[in-house]
């Protein structure tokens, strides 16, 4: 987490406009590992690990009035549960191409693309990142994603990158201190 984040003016200008925060899941909300627990030869239980600091950040984002969501290529009941716990409004799973989901969210919210932030880590995220007003790469994203991003987190995927992005947005808006007072468990 970047608690003493110094925000360059151009980045601040982008971040202060954000009203919708979208993100990838595997390699962004999680560290990218996919753990499978075999139950039978045909059935496996998928286990995902989510970061508590990222969760607190998502709760603060919701409290601040940001609309949040995720777009992922995989189907996951663990993700669905976590997304609901974090008050995510938009949950798009089984999306091999992310642009149709992104465009639908932009249409549903009625916000300009300059008011949308997207956090990603890998090649399927690049088309959305090219359109989002604030494109964020997690610290361990592939080089092509980092090159596309307006900001790369110091934190790694699944270890505070979402929280760092939310802090960037809320600090740019000048409401971070007020959100600290509203933090809840």
Predicted regions and their residues:
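Active-site neighborhood of HAD-like aspartate-dependent phosphohydrolases
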Residues: 2-64
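Fold-independent oxyanion-binding glycine-rich loops
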Residues: 24-26, 32, 74, 121, ...
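Mg2+-dependent phosphoryl-transfer enzymes with acidic/Ser/Thr/Gly-rich catalytic loops
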Residues: 43-44, 51, 91, 99-185
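Substrate-recognition element of Asp-dependent hydrolases with the DxDx(T/V) motif
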Residues: 34, 57-82, 92-93, 129
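A general structural signal for stabilizing positions within well-ordered secondary structure
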Residues: 9-12, 82, 143
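Short secondary-structure boundary/capping elements
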Residues: 49-53, 71, 94-97
């Amino acid at each position: 987490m970047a608690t003493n984040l110094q925000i360059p003016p151009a980045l601040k200008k982008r971040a202060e406009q954000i009203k919708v925060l979208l993100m990838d899941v595997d390699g962004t909300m999680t560290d990218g590992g996919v753990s499978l627990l075999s139950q039978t030869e045909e059935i496996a239980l998928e286990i995902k690990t989510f970061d508590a600091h990222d969760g607190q950040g998502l709760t603060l984002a919701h409290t601040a009035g940001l609309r949040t969501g995720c777009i992922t290529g995989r189907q996951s009941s663990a993700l669905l549960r976590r997304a609901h716990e974090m008050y995510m409004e938009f949950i798009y799973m089984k999306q091999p191409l992310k642009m149709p989901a992104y465009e639908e969210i932009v249409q549903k919210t009625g916000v300009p693309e300059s008011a949308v932030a997207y956090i990603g880590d890998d090649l399927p995220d690049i088309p959305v990142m090219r359109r989002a007003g604030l494109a964020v790469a997690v610290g361990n994203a592939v080089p092509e994603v980092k090159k596309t991003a307006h900001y790369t987190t110091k934190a790694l995927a699944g270890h505070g990158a979402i929280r760092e992005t939310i802090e960037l947005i809320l600090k740019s808006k000048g409401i971070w201190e007020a959100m600290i007072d509203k933090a809840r468990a």
